[in-house]
Amino acid sequence: WCHVMAHESFEDLQVAEVLNRYFVAVKVDREERPDVDAVYLRVCQALTGGAGWPLTIIMTPEQQPFFAGTYLPKNGVGGRIGLLQLLRAVAGKWSGSREELLRAGRDATAALRAMPRTEPAPLNEELLKKAAGQLAASYDAEYGGFGSAPKFPSAHDLIFLQRYAYHTGDKAAKEELENTLRQMYKGGIYDHFGGGFARYSTDREWLAPHFEKTLYDNAMLALCYTEAWQNSRMALYRQVAEATLDYCLRELRADSGGFYCGQDADSGGEEGAHYLFTPAEVKKLLGEDDGRHFCECYDITDEGNFHGKSIPNLLLNTRWSFVPEGYAEFRERLRDYRAERTPLAADTKLLASWNGLMLMALSRAARAFDSSRYLAAAERLAEFMRSGFGLGADMRACAYGGETRFPAQLDDYAFSALGFLELYRASFDPVHIISAAKQAEQITARFAAPSGGFYRTAQDAEQLITRPMEVFDGAMPSGNSAAAQLFVSLARLTGEERWRAAAEKQLEFMAGYGAEQPAGMAFALCAMMELIYPTKELVCAAADEEEPAMLAAVRAKYAPELEVLLKTPSSAETLAAAAPFTADCAPRGGKAQFYICTGGQCSLPVTE
């Protein structure tokens, strides 16, 4: 609808004439300015009871909003006001009854600034059970996922279910997770020929997506499927994770090593045209017999399932998990064909927060799959993030056209730091722990709210009509959820009490804030589990630079209760600076020693 309104109204001369005569029109990219987006989404929710995009706000010169809405047609239809009608009505009222609009703006601004206070709450399993129950209540047992159409992947909900089932043995949570992962793979929301997932499904079956692909969705889903493979060793999950990461590396990676925001849904002005096929096209490329069998496999029919053409999917294929191996070459040929037939445009912005998520996904896959290719991509991305976006107080949020823009916000610091920590787990280079700690220090120093939690913007950022704070997760985890996970991970990897105290304070704030709707902060609950359930750290003090075979096997497993650190002669000094509790861990007699630690206190070592 953003594209529709842009073409229908903002590219229309009649609309432009009215806008320019009576208003100062400002079009905001919500990805470049998520703080502005967050503030005015709350305005729309307060004034209308709902919110979404495109978001239309009319405000006074003092930035006080008095009208909010989402998509508006150029001309009124079916009792719905049109944009032209609205603009003329507001312009008339501004001339004749301005005080009424000013008063409405003041009232809306005052309501926006009145943020409810919540008391911290203790951490306990009941909150986890309540969240699992809320997800179960909206679970679609037939097609997987949660809620009805439109249906979103919500990878952070799935990651929560994975960890909750692991810690508690909850069979229902495990089934919800695994059925959803399978059904999303079978559907048209997954790109069977090129890898990666579309933004959301317009139906409950996951068949017909909104075809836009975004970096953050694919990074989070790659992470989710990688974790699922670590936990189950089901080959399908690894296949999907690798195909999704390979899509990002092939289609979204910039020359700098960073990653673009995503690819458009439209091709040649037609929604989804890039992804649609007819049997005739397939048979022309693959031959009559191979093409016919391939079409039967992927539900490509003469009737089509989307405006007369077909979205490839496996929903009707009872042998969906046994797609012939030889079809991999066919899928690649069709992928190359469609790239020339209907090329896609990319959104070539690079965002620090989204690249942090991609760093997490690449690093986790490098560790889980023992992949030097993914590790090299992750290290190159980390280098770009340090040099391109920067670290510390001068970090920038966005890179575009060779320039960096806008001061970094909470999400940028939190997700980049989590990415650095995942890269440490994959590479054992302790400099990444130090980078993550520097980012975390910026969060605690510049983003903290007096009553708990963290604002989206720093204390020295541009002042909007209110300072936004998001606690609940949305399409991606909230900055507050990410900060909670960051503090917990730093506490475990460094052994420093300051990070454990920060983690407890943040999670107690979130437990109080989200007491009635804990499923809305699923990513934070993953961090909470690390404080509720027993954890341990394994420090390997190696006699040389080689990673012991036993350690490689241990760290490839799914074990959220275990952190692994490797100390070699070359990394010993830097690791001791990053994680002081490892200073006394040393090899003996030319052999590696393994130390089991909890809370920075280590037991006597054992030999491999």
Please identify what each model-predicted range represents.
Residues 1-368, 507-608:
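Replace the tail clause
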Residues 183-190, 380-388:
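Glycine-rich, acidic and aromatic/proline-enriched surface loops and short helix-turn segments
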Residues 237, 374, 404-407:
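Catalytic nucleophile-loop/oxyanion-hole region of alpha/beta-hydrolase
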